[in-house]
Amino acid sequence: MESPTHPKPSKDKTLSWNLAFLVGILFTIDIGMANPSPHQIYNVTWVITNVQTNTQANATSMLGTLTDAYPTLHVDLCDLVGDTWEPIVLNPTNVKHGARYSSSKYGCKTTDRKKQQQTYPFYVCPGHAPSLGPKGTHCGGAQDGFCAAWGCETTGEAWWKPTSSWDYITVKRGSSQDNSCEGKCNPLVLQFTQKGRQASWDGPKMWGLRLYRTGYDPIALFTVSRQVSTITPPQAMGPNLVLPDQKPPSRQSQTGSKVATQRPQTNESAPRSVAPTTMGPKRIGTGDRLINLVQGTYLALNATDPNKTKDCWLCLVSRPPYYEGIAILGNYSNQTNPPPSCLSTPQHKLTISEVSGQGMCIGTVPKTHQALCNKTQQGHTGAHYLAAPNGTYWACNTGLTPCISMAVLNWTSDFCVLIELWPRVTYHQPEYVYTHFAKAVRFRREPISLTVALMLGGLTVGGIAAGVGTGTKALLETAQFRQLQMAMHTDIQALEESISALEKSLTSLSEVVLQNRRGLDILFLQEGGLCAALKEECCFYADHTGLVRDNMAKLRERLKQRQQLFDSQQGWFEGWFNKSPWFTTLISSIMGPLLILLLILLFGPCILNRLVQFVKDRISVVQALILTQQYQQIKQYDPDRP
């Protein structure tokens, strides 16, 4: 994009901030659905956030797919600005160095000021992709509103009409019906461009909005993020009434954990298949069992959408629930004799505390769970066995089972929902982890996670596990999905064995203890250096080479590369202020005396010479006056005159 010519110098666009600003994450990861269900309907909410105050300026919700849910967003300029146009004070010690604007008459504190904002142009600069900006132009960071130089602006309402071919949004003024400005009278209209509709909204995208005026242009920072949720909220299925009411543990300040001197012994070999009716003499260790869940998730995700596994983090959640169910519509088998899947039914009642979606229901479903049913069957008479398709389970009121008996179902007035079972493995873009480990000031934001269930939900319905596929791709996806199912089956068997050891305890106490055991398993992996501990998740780095086992070394390597790239983009003068936290104060303290001393050395000799010359001239005049007073002037006589 060519830089427009403006009457204002570019130095006016640079403020005296010297700290980098990083924003945490609050949004929902962009969902890449599997091929069988590209038309899945979600509740999509677009949120515009005022970064200065960390408040929500606007939220727009709609029902639609992830391809067409891009509505026109409306927000008021004063919701992005506040009472006064002021920059963010990233460091409280920066206030005394001029980090605030001296003028505050450009805010929205009064009605007159709101009207005044309508007369000033504004321009917007993106901060989500600095590498796509104009070549040879340093657009700065959040402290500059990403507009440190002309040519960085991509949209706005100004006389030079800033445009861009690569930015995600356009921001223009809307029409206001409130001429008195008693309410909101500075409407802005935000629309998504074609590039924005194709972008991966895996986190909040930030922009800087600057008011075009004389002097420094004030800054307002805002983010646009997308939140995706299912239409029906998840509900608990199972006999345990304690788990649905459990809340996540309170977040405490994260302290540095000690690294174990020895790495945990892990079994590098792939998990062997276990017969349904017999248990192998050797059970794989806890570390291998959890890593196999992540490995199977990676293989299934890579087979369905390789673009998602090009560069990502797969995280095991350390808080319950550890599995979630997606209700589906499937063709179950009705048999008079119990199939092999019925023989491997768990001996204990396992509760799935999160079931979402709509699918096939069997039995008398109460009103509290009818939202999970797309199709309901009352059941069959006689001693029939209903076996769930491969890769699916029946989530019943009495627990999780791959097969249900109609005789028991009719006798107990139970009900079941056909579900896909997925481990609670969350998917994150690499930026999510790097921003948490980077040593920079940032706002605290709650992460929004995309679980594998949302990304691969409906996979069995599409025919990968339940149906018969043709071609190499179908066979490959079937193998990868079965490996994930084998890892889940092994993990569920281990959980069931743990419950058997506590069978004399209360059911609720047993499952709570089991959940604490999973939390200890996650800590075990963290102490061994296999995972990057991030809040309440255990993250494993993955790319097209597969799952990386030594994650901490990989994380340190990539953080070092990012730091080198960041340092290379900084100017030599800007880099001084990042070397030490007290360097800014030292420079500002001694810069004044140094400048005065330099001016004295440059202009002192010239001023001194002129002063000496002036004194000499005055002395010469005084000496001449003294000499003339000692003598009398002789009168001249003209002899020709009488």
UniProtKB/Swiss-Prot annotation:
Where is the stretch described as Fusion peptide? 448-468
Show the GO cellular component annotation of the record. host cell plasma membrane; membrane; viral envelope; virion membrane
What post-translational changes are documented for it?
Answer: Specific enzymatic cleavages in vivo yield mature proteins. Envelope glycoproteins are synthesized as an inactive precursor that is N-glycosylated and processed likely by host cell furin or by a furin-like protease in the Golgi to yield the mature SU and TM proteins. The cleavage site between SU and TM requires the minimal sequence [KR]-X-[KR]-R. The R-peptide is released from the C-terminus of the cytoplasmic tail of the TM protein upon particle formation as a result of proteolytic cleavage by the viral protease. Cleavage of this peptide is required for TM to become fusogenic. The CXXC motif is highly conserved across a broad range of retroviral envelope proteins. It is thought to participate in the formation of a labile disulfide bond possibly with the CX6CC motif present in the transmembrane protein. Isomerization of the intersubunit disulfide bond to an SU intrachain disulfide bond is thought to occur upon receptor recognition in order to allow membrane fusion.
Indicate whether DNA damage appears among the record's keywords: no
| Site, as annotated: Cleavage | R445, E446, L625, I626
Q: Which Pfam families match?
A: TLV_coat (PF00429)
Lipidated sites in chain (S-palmitoyl cysteine): C606
Spans annotated as Disordered: 233-283
> Whom does it interact with, and what assembly results?
The mature envelope protein (Env) consists of a trimer of SU-TM heterodimers attached by a labile interchain disulfide bond.
Q: Which residues are glycosylated?
A: N43, N58, N267, N302, N307, N334, N374, N390, N410
Task: Show the coiled coil region(s).
Answer: 476-525, 535-571
Protein name according to UniProt: Envelope glycoprotein
Where the record places motif CXXC is 312-315
Which residues are exposed on the Cytoplasmic face of the membrane?
608-642
UniProt keywords (A-Z) are: Cleavage on pair of basic residues, Coiled coil, Disulfide bond, Fusion of virus membrane with host cell membrane, Fusion of virus membrane with host membrane, Glycoprotein, Host cell membrane, Host membrane, Host-virus interaction, Lipoprotein, Membrane, Palmitate, Signal, Transmembrane, Transmembrane helix, Viral attachment to host cell, Viral envelope protein, Viral penetration into host cytoplasm, Virion, Virus entry into host cell
Role summary: The surface protein (SU) attaches the virus to the host cell by binding to its receptor. This interaction triggers the refolding of the transmembrane protein (TM) and is thought to activate its fusogenic potential by unmasking its fusion peptide. Fusion occurs at the host cell plasma membrane. The transmembrane protein (TM) acts as a class I viral fusion protein. Under the current model, the protein has at least 3 conformational states: pre-fusion native state, pre-hairpin intermediate state, and post-fusion hairpin state. During viral and target cell membrane fusion, the coiled coil regions (heptad repeats) assume a trimer-of-hairpins structure, positioning the fusion peptide in close proximity to the C-terminal region of the ectodomain. The formation of this structure appears to drive apposition and subsequent fusion of viral and target cell membranes.
- Please give the record's comment on domains: The 17 amino acids long immunosuppressive region is present in many retroviral envelope proteins. Synthetic peptides derived from this relatively conserved sequence inhibit immune function in vitro and in vivo.
Position of sequence motif CX6CC: 531-539
- PANTHER family, A to Z: BC035947 PROTEIN-RELATED, VIRAL ENVELOPE PROTEIN
Under InterPro entries, the record lists: FMuLV_rcpt-bd (IPR008981), TLV/ENV_coat_polyprotein (IPR018154)
* Residues passing through the membrane, by range: 587-607
Q: Which GO terms describe its biological process?
A: fusion of virus membrane with host plasma membrane; symbiont entry into host cell; virion attachment to host cell
Q: Where is this region: Immunosuppression?
A: 514-530
Native source species: Feline leukemia virus (strain A/Glasgow-1)
In this UniProt entry, which cysteines form S-S bonds? C125-C147, C139-C152, C312-C315, C312-C539, C531-C538
